[in-house]
């Protein structure tokens, strides 16, 4: 089972914590993580892009000139796609881009992302993370005392409101509750800063 250092809020190492091998110790599957991120980004798409066809563009009801006898090319509407101010041929229409990967694939992707953080030594586990009141300054001090990167994902077990409010205004820092942890954020942020309680919650769900 992988072991990582356990820190307190002052940045002092207070011991070690054993992580569940089936969640934090598997060989990361790059292809599955790619598929999951692709699904996440597709599901975020609004799908509202829309262009007008020749039938929907205003005007163009009258035939510009008669069919024969002018020497010009035959044309039925001044709003055909070839003309200026014409409609769009095969343009985007509103659609739903969302889809869902199988449950086992989603779980494997999450375990792979968590394991990659452990392998790359980009996980910092805190004994606890609590504030009496929301103060950005206190969160900044805590982050400065810990070995974290410029972009840090702060994960707590149940989304402590004081922690969320203290962290959400810091550039490059994203607070998250354990139930909302996802592959895209794990890969997008340099360091995973997670509480011991959140680790237990994740292991409870994915082990």
UniProtKB/Swiss-Prot annotation:
Superkingdom of source: Bacteria
A GO BP entry: translation
Residue ranges, annotated region (Disordered): 47-78
Cellular component aspect of the GO annotation: ribonucleoprotein complex; ribosome
Keywords: Ribonucleoprotein, Ribosomal protein, RNA-binding, rRNA-binding
Keyword RNA-binding set for record: yes
Cross-referenced InterPro entries: Ribosomal_uL4 (IPR002136), Ribosomal_uL4-like (IPR013005), Ribosomal_uL4_dom_sf (IPR023574)
GO molecular function, one term: rRNA binding
Biased composition (Basic residues): 60-71
Pfam families assigned to the protein according to its UniProt record, in alphabetical order: Ribosomal_L4
Assembly behavior: Part of the 50S ribosomal subunit.
Summary of the function given for this chain in its UniProt record: One of the primary rRNA binding proteins, this protein initially binds near the 5'-end of the 23S rRNA. It is important during the early stages of 50S assembly. It makes multiple contacts with different domains of the 23S rRNA in the assembled 50S subunit and ribosome. Forms part of the polypeptide exit tunnel.
Family: Belongs to the universal ribosomal protein uL4 family.
Protein's name according to its UniProt entry: Large ribosomal subunit protein uL4
Originating species: Syntrophomonas wolfei subsp. wolfei (strain DSM 2245B / Goettingen)
Record gene name: rplD
